[in-house]
Amino acid sequence: MRATDKKLKVACGANTGYLADSQWIGDKTPPTLCDVRVSPNNSVKPNIGAGELAEALNRVLPFTAKEDNRPILQCVKFAAKDGKLTLVSADGFRLAVIALDYDDGEGQALVSRDDLKGIANALKRAKRARVSFERSGDSLDGMSLILDTELIRYKWRSMDGSYPAYEELIPTEFNAFAHFDAIEAVKAVNSLKVPAFSKAYPIDLTFGNGKVVMANPDDKGQAELNADTGGEAIKVRLDGGYLVQALKVCGGMVDFKITNSYSPTLFSSNGYQLVAMPMMTSEASEQAKADREAKAKQAEAEAVTQAEAVAQAHTEAAVLADEQGDEATEDIEPVADKPRRKRKVREPVAVA
């Protein structure tokens, strides 16, 4: 490639072509900036592993939203804070989070999934990588994400908007867990895909006694997988396609944790977390209804207990006040009435 007068000359073998200035820019072209460094001696002080960042991108990009009416969820969130660079993506049904070591300041930016296409492959060929944030334009809250390699600089202006509070969506309490090989689990799920005869196929998972049992609804097929298990025996239903995608992204040994049959499930592997919503079944709906009623009764009972405690406290306070009042009355000595002084009756005086 060689830049000429407002043109870019591209030569590949015997073929030569020219690209005029702004010729490749269309209505849907994202407003990004890409600088090509021509100096082979350009030095980049790395602050993150290029391969590590490439793997992180490949783990979050599949879970961004594809619908144009949700532009914020079409982005990957980059957030640097407390010595970590966290990448977050979500599509409304799944949430992916991965944190990398990063000790070079703080900042955050929302970058469109379309802008990040091909970046992971470019990073795999790069020897050094550096991630930084800078203020964009005159805006006080505008931020740009910059990725430098020894050859190319990428600069993306953050999309305007607020990302959902994803931390609240990651479950922290669980009633059952399993630790197993993701590759073997993918093979087990694929063996159940054939009997389903459908692109969208649900898979029921139950684990306990050192095994994970995967089955099609209506007992069309079943597969077992050795695993380290613990907790209660709970059955949860997941979309088969989502399950395979989650297992492939996790890779290696994976931890799978669930709370009940209707709450979000959690896949985790080496600092990577993937939250997936289960599919609702009649059993899950009944359990959710029963749990809601139980919580309502518990809340009502706690409210009654609290009201009774407050009433009891008021009663005791009133009784104590009465007792203290009686004691104060008894301590006061009665004052004796002073005897009244008799008045002398004046005698009549005779007048001569």
Q: What label would you give each PLM region?
A:
Residues M1-A352:
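Structural preference for solvent-exposed beta-strand-turn elements
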